[in-house]
Amino acid sequence: MEAPLRVSLGRIIAQGLVPATAARSPLDAVENLAALQGQQASAIPWAIGARCMGVSPARVEESFARGELVRSWPMRGTVHVTSARDHHWLRRLLRHRRAAWERQALSQGLTDALVERAAQVACDLLETSPQGVSRAELVEAWGRSGIDTVTASSSQVGLRRRHLIMRLHLDGVLTAGPVRAGEHLIVDA
């Protein structure tokens, strides 16, 4: 067997994509991988379900609702799904990969003082909504508190908001959990 084919087959086996190595639950599937890319929210149940035997997309969403799985940025600028119990150590371990991103966030005016204020507003909001809030609800709360989440440049609409949410994920304040209307709600990390 040629080396590239062996490598490909080894990856398929290691990722739990064959019955012999498939996980028993969504939590096991994600923990076996440490982290699973999750940019496209609608594809997450299928990506996890493909690594489990007989698991429906609804069962994957139940794992998020129970707080077993979270969606966040534990490393670089790519959204990943991790287990809730692995999220914080992964986030801390991979913190060194944030330098370039932090420079860009600072250029958006995201000072430590602003981030701390935004974190407090988010935590206050989540105290009254422990099941989670949508991005729109969080951004609205920030607006009521005088925190501007809009960039001046029309070519960068949403970039400041994204950077602020991402910073609070990377700092371990927020993460995304249960799904409502196709959106992962923001919850207390």
Predicted region positions:
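Short beta-strand-centered interaction patches in the first periplasmic/extracellular domains
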Residues: H163-I165, A176, E183-I186
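Beta-hairpin "wing" of winged helix-turn-helix
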Residues: W73, G177-P178
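Phosphate-backbone binding and catalysis cores of DNA-processing enzymes
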Residues: M1-T151, V157
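Short, cationic-aromatic polyanion-contact patches
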Residues: V81-H87, R180-A189
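Short, hydrophobic-biased segments on the C-terminal half of alpha helices
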Residues: V60-E61, R162-M166
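Functionally engaged cysteine thiol sites
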Residues: A152-S153, R162
